[in-house]
C-alpha cells in the first residue's frame, strides 16, 4: 500500500473512470440548484437526480464525480468519533442504463487493488442474501466465503419505499487487531468500530417498488456508487482517524498557532482523558471551518434562518471550542486560506474571512456575558435550567440552542425541551435530510414512456392541431383525465418549449371540446419528449388545438437573447476567462452569474450595459446553424454543460449574432437585436465570495417600470431625509418640480437625494460636535462590575445619535439617556456595547409602563413621565443579572 496525498487519490479516481469512458462531472455547489427537497447537497448522487429520474439527458451513460456534500443531522458526533463530518467528499461512479453488476464490481476491485494497491487480504465484502450474481462475481475474484458476508434486507437492500430500488454490496477495509481485537462479527452484527471501515457501497438499482411492496424488474438498470473520500485517505495515510490526514492536519497546525495546547495523534491509542477533550476541540474546529468556508463560498450568509442559521451555528460552535482551547480572540477567519489549500479549491479568501471575522466579533461580544448568565442560573437553581433561560441565551446572546445543550451535557445536566419546540421550529430550520439518492420523486406513470414520441415545432410554429401520444396522472396512463389533479400529456407535435438551458417553459393553452386549459409546466423526459403539466379534463383519442402565448414567448426570447449578449459584453469587459456559472430567464427578467476576483465597478457595469444597447442599435440578425461538435469548436462556439446535456454531439444547434457571439443553445431567440428595444441592468450583487449576479430587464416597457419603481423609492428616501433635517432645522423646506419625462425626473431626484444626504451629514456633524466632550463623571454609576451613565436632561434632537456616539467612544459604559416629549411623555434610549440594550429597555417599560423596542446595541421607547433617578438605580441593582 502506497502512501498518497488526498489530491493524488482524488485525481487517480477521476482518471481511472475516465479511462473507462466515464464523463467527469465537476463538484457542484453545496446549495442545491432548482431542488427544494434538499437543504444541502448531502450525497454524491444528489446533483445527478434529474439524470436518474429521466428529467434531464446525461452527457454520457457513464458518469464519475467527486462531490462535496454537507450534513448536520448528527453534528454532536463530529469531533467525538473518528469519521463523522459536516463537510465530506463522495467519490462516485454511475451507470445509467449501461453496465451493471459484473463491470461495477470489476471496476471497484481494480481501482482498490491496482491503483491504490490495497491488499485484497484486507478487504471484506457484504452482499444481499439471494443476490447470487454478486456473490459469485466476488468469489471469482478470489474472495473466500469467510470474506463474503451475507446481508439482510435491512443492511443490503436500498429501498426508499417507492420507485427504483435494489440490493447493494459494501466493501470494508480491515485495519487490523490494534484497532479492535474482535473479528468480522463486527460487520455481521453491525457493531460500530474503528477496525473494519466501510469505504465503498455499490447500489444495484434493478427493481421498481410500486409503493405497495410489489417489485418488478426495471428495463433500464442503473449503478449508483459511493466511496468515502476521507476514509480512503485515512487508510492510505495510515491515520488512526480521518482527522489524522493531510485534509485536516494542516488546519489543525494552523489552529495550534493560536493556543498553548497541541493536538496529539498518538492519544487515539493512549486515551488520556484531558488530551481526548483537547483533540475533540481541535477536530470540531477543523471540521467546521471546512463546511463554513465552502458554504459561504457557495453563497450562504450566516443568519438566523434556514441554511444561514446552520452556518452561524457551526461558526459559534467552532468559536466556543476555540474558547475551550484558551483562544480568547477571533481566529477562525485566519483558517480560510489553509482550507483552500487542503481542498485544492480557489476561494475569495478576503471576502470569506471578512464574513467569518464579523460573525466571530459579534459572538465574542456576547459569549462571556451569556456564559456568565448560564453559570449564575445554574447556581441559583441548583444545576437546573429553565427553558426561558435557554431561549434568552439564543435570543439575546446568540447561543444556538444546540450549543447550550452541549455545554449542559458536558456538565451532566439535562433540560426540558418541550417548551422550546415552537421556538426551534421558528428559529432552527435545521436539515433533517435523510441519506437519499437521486432516485426519489419519480412520477411513476412517466416510466411507461419507452421512446421519443413527440416533436418540438415551436421555433417557427405557434399554434397547431395535433394528437395526444401519451396521457397520464401521477401513477398510471389514462384514457381521460378527471380535472381534479395534476396530469401529464405528450403531444405528437408541440409548440411549447420545455424548461431547459436556463430558459423557462412556454405558456399557453390546450383547447378541446370548447374547453380551454392552461399549461402549467413543460419539462423534458430522458427521450427528449416535452411533458406538459396541466389540470383539467381532456380525452386521449380526440384531437386537440394548442395555442402558444406569443406575448409571453416574445418576452422569454428577449431575455434569453439578452443573456447571450450580456455574456458576450462581460467577456469584452473583463476578458475571455469570464464563465457562465448560471442563468435564469423568465418572461419578466433575466439573471446571470459569473466569477470575478473583485467587485465590478459601477462604471464597468454601465459599460457592459452600454455595449449591449449598441448591439441593439446595430440591428443584428440572429442566425441558427445545426452542426457537429468538431465544426462548432472551429467556430469557437461558447458551450456550457447545461446546454450540452440536451443535445446530440452530432446535431448541435448554434445561435449566432454576427461579430458578437456564437453559442450552443437549444432555446428560443428574437430574430433581430432591435427587438430587445432596451437592455437595463437592475443590479450587480455578490452571490457569494467571488461570484456575482447581474439582474436585468429588456424592452422599453420593463425599463419604464423599473424607472417608476426607482422614482418612488427615491421620493420615499427624500421624504425621510427631509423629515430628519426638519428635526434639526424646523424651518427647512423643499419644493420638487413636476417633470413629465421619466428619465429627467429620475436624474433630477437622484441628485436631490445625494445633495440632501450630504447636507444632513453636515448637520449631524455639527450636532455631534456638541456631545463629543468628556462625560460628566457625576452621572456614572457603578453597579457590580458594570458602569452605567444616566442623563435624563438631554435635547430631544439626535438623542439616538448621541447615544450611539457615546457608546462607540466608551464601550465599557452602558448609557441610559432621556428627553421630554409632548404631553408629558418621556423618551428613553438605552445604548450598550456589553449588555443587551433591548433587555434593559424591556424591564424599564415593564416597570414604568411604556412601549418600544430595539436590538442588542441600542433600543428606544417612551414612558408616561420622567422617572426619578433613584428609582432607576434601584431597578438596575435588582435586575443586573438578567441583562
Curated annotation (Swiss-Prot):
Catalytic reaction equation(s): tRNA(Ala) + L-alanine + ATP = L-alanyl-tRNA(Ala) + AMP + diphosphate
A GO molecular function held by the record: zinc ion binding
The protein's enzyme class: ligase
Record text on cofactor binding: Binds 1 zinc ion per subunit.
SMART domains: tRNA_SAD
EC number(s) reported in the record: 6.1.1.7
Organism domain of life: Bacteria
Keyword terms, alphabetized: Aminoacyl-tRNA synthetase, ATP-binding, Cytoplasm, Ligase, Metal-binding, Nucleotide-binding, Protein biosynthesis, RNA-binding, tRNA-binding, Zinc
UniProt-listed GO biological process terms: alanyl-tRNA aminoacylation
GO CC entries: cytosol
Residues binding Zn(2+): 560, 564, 665, 669
Essential cofactor(s): Zn(2+)
Compartment list: Cytoplasm
Assigned protein family: Belongs to the class-II aminoacyl-tRNA synthetase family.
Domain notes: Consists of three domains; the N-terminal catalytic domain, the editing domain and the C-terminal C-Ala domain. The editing domain removes incorrectly charged amino acids, while the C-Ala domain, along with tRNA(Ala), serves as a bridge to cooperatively bring together the editing and aminoacylation centers thus stimulating deacylation of misacylated tRNAs.
Stored HAMAP family: Ala_tRNA_synth_B
Function: Catalyzes the attachment of alanine to tRNA(Ala) in a two-step reaction: alanine is first activated by ATP to form Ala-AMP and then transferred to the acceptor end of tRNA(Ala). Also edits incorrectly charged Ser-tRNA(Ala) and Gly-tRNA(Ala) via its editing domain.
Name listed for the protein in its UniProt record: Alanine--tRNA ligase
Species classification: Bacteria, Bacillati, Mycoplasmatota, Mycoplasmoidales, Metamycoplasmataceae
The encoding gene: alaS
Amino acid at each position: 500500500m502506497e502512501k498518497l496525498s488526498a489530491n493524488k487519490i482524488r485525481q487517480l479516481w477521476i482518471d481511472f473512470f475516465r479511462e473507462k469512458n466515464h464523463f467527469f462531472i465537476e463538484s457542484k455547489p453545496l446549495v442545491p440548484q432548482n431542488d427544494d427537497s434538499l437543504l444541502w447537497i448531502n450525497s454524491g448522487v444528489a446533483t445527478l437526480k434529474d439524470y436518474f429520474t429521466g428529467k434531464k439527458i446525461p452527457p454520457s451513460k457513464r458518469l464519475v464525480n467527486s462531490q462535496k456534500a454537507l450534513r448536520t443531522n448528527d453534528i454532536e458526533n463530529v469531533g467525538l468519533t473518528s469519521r463523522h463530518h459536516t463537510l465530506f467528499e463522495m467519490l462516485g461512479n454511475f451507470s445509467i442504463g449501461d453496465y451493471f453488476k459484473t463491470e461495477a464490481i470489476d471496476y471497484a476491485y481494480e481501482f482498490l487493488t491496482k491503483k491504490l494497491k490495497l491488499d485484497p487480504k484486507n478487504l471484506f465484502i457484504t452482499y444481499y442474501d439471494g443476490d447470487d450474481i454478486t456473490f459469485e462475481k466476488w468469489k471469482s475474484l478470489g474472495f473466500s466465503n469467510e470474506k463474503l458476508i451475507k446481508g439482510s434486507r435491512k443492511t443490503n437492500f436500498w429501498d426508499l419505499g417507492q420507485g427504483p430500488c435494489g440490493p447493494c454490496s459494501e466493501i470494508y477495509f480491515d485495519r487490523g487487531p490494534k484497532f479492535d481485537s474482535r473479528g468480522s462479527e463486527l460487520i455481521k452484527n453491525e457493531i460500530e468500530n474503528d477496525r473494519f471501515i466501510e469505504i465503498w457501497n455499490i447500489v444495484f438499482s434493478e427493481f421498481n417498488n410500486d409503493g405497495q411492496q410489489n417489485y418488478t424488474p426495471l428495463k433500464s438498470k442503473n449503478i449508483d456508487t459511493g466511496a468515502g473520500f476521507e476514509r480512503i485517505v485515512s487508510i492510505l495515510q495510515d491515520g488512526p482517524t480521518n482527522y489524522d490526514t493531510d485534509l485536516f492536519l494542516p488546519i489543525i497546525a494552523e489552529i495550534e498557532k493560536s493556543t498553548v495546547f497541541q493536538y496529539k495523534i498518538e492519544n487515539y491509542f493512549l486515551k488520556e482523558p484531558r488530551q481526548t477533550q483537547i483533540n475533540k476541540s481541535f477536530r470540531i474546529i477543523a471540521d467546521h471551518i471546512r463546511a463554513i468556508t465552502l458554504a459561504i463560498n457557495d453563497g450562504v450568509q450566516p443568519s438566523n434562518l434556514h441554511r444561514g442559521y446552520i452556518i452561524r451555528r457551526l461558526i459559534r460552535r467552532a468559536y466556543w471550542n476555540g474558547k475551550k482551547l484558551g483562544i480568547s480572540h477571533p481566529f477562525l477567519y485566519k483558517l480560510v486560506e489553509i482550507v483552500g489549500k487542503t481542498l485544492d479549491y480557489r476561494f475569495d479568501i478576503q471576502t470569506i474571512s471578512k464574513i467569518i471575522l464579523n460573525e466571530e466579533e459579534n459572538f465574542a461580544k456576547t459569549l462571556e456575558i451569556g456564559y456568565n448568565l448560564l453559570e449564575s442560573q445554574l447556581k441559583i437553581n441548583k444545576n437546573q435550567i429553565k427553558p426561558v433561560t435557554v431561549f434568552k441565551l439564543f435570543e439575546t446572546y446568540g447561543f444556538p440552542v444546540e450549543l447550550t445543550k452541549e455545554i449542559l451535557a458536558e456538565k451532566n445536566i439535562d433540560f426540558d425541551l418541550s417548551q422550546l419546540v415552537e421556538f426551534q421550529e421558528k428559529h432552527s430550520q435545521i436539515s433533517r435530510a435523510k441519506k437519499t439518492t437521486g432516485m426519489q420523486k419519480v412520477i411513476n406513470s412517466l416510466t411507461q414512456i419507452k421512446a421519443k414520441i413527440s416533436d418540438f415545432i415551436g421555433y417557427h410554429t405557434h399554434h397547431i392541431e395535433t394528437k395526444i401520444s401519451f396521457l397520464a396522472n401521477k401513477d398510471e396512463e389514462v384514457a381521460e383525465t378527471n380535472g381534479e389533479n395534476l396530469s401529464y400529456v405528450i403531444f405528437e407535435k408541440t409548440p411549447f418549449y420545455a424548461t431547459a438551458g436556463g430558459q423557462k417553459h412556454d405558456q399557453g393553452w390546450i383547447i378541446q371540446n370548447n374547453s380551454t386549459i392552461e399549461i402549467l409546466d413543460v419539462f423534458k423526459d430522458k427521450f427528449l419528449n416535452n411533458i406538459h403539466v396541466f389540470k383539467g379534463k381532456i380525452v386521449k383519442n380526440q384531437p386537440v388545438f394548442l395555442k402558444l402565448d406569443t406575448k409571453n414567448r416574445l418576452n422569454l426570447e428577449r431575455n434569453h437573447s439578452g443573456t447571450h449578449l450580456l455574456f458576450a459584453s462581460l467577456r469584452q469587459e473583463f476578458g475571455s476567462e469570464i464563465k457562465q456559472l448560471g442563468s435564469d430567464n423568465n418572461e419578466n427578467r433575466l439573471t446571470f452569474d459569473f466569477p470575478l476576483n473583485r467587485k465590478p465597478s459601477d462604471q464597468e457595469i454601465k459599460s457592459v450595459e452600454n455595449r449591449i444597447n449598441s448591439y441593439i442599435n446595430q440591428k443584428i440578425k440572429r442566425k441558427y446553424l445545426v452542426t457537429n461538435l468538431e465544426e462548432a469548436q472551429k467556430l469557437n462556439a461558447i458551450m456550457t454543460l447545461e446546454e450540452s446535456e440536451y443535445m446530440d454531439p452530432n446535431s448541435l444547434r448554434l445561435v449566432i449574432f454576427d461579430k458578437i457571439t456564437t453559442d450552443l443553445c437549444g432555446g428560443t431567440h428574437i430574430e433581430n437585436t432591435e427587438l430587445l428595444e432596451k437592455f437595463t441592468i437592475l443590479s450587480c450583487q455578490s452571490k457569494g465570495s467571488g461570484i456575482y449576479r447581474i439582474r436585468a430587464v429588456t424592452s422599453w416597457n420593463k425599463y419604464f417600470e423599473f424607472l417608476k419603481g426607482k422614482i418612488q423609492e427615491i421620493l420615499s428616501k427624500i421624504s425621510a431625509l427631509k423629515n430628519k433635517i426638519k428635526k434639526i432645522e424646523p424651518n427647512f423646506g423643499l419644493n420638487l418640480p413636476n417633470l413629465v419625462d421619466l428619465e429627467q425626473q429620475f436624474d433630477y431626484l437622484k441628485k436631490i437625494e445625494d445633495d440632501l444626504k450630504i447636507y444632513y451629514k453636515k448637520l449631524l456633524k455639527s450636532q455631534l460636535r456638541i456631545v463629543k466632550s468628556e462625560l460628566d463623571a457625576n452621572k456614572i454609576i457603578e453597579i457590580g462590575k458594570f458602569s452605567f451613565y444616566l442623563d435624563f436632561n438631554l435635547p430631544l434632537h439626535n438623542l439616538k445619535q448621541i447615544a450611539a456616539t457615546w457608546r462607540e467612544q466608551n464601550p465599557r459604559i452602558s448609557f441610559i439617556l432621556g428627553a421630554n416629549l409632548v404631553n408629558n411623555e418621556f423618551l428613553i434610549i438605552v445604548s450598550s456595547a456589553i449588555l443587551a440594550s433591548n433587555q434593559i429597555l424591556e424591564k424599564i417599560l415593564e416597570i414604568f409602563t411604556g412601549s418600544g423596542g430595539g436590538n442588542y446595541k441600542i433600543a428606544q421607547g417612551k414612558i408616561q413621565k420622567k422617572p426619578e433617578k433613584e428609582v432607576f438605580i434601584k431597578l438596575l441593582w435588582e435586575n443586573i443579572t438578567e441583562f
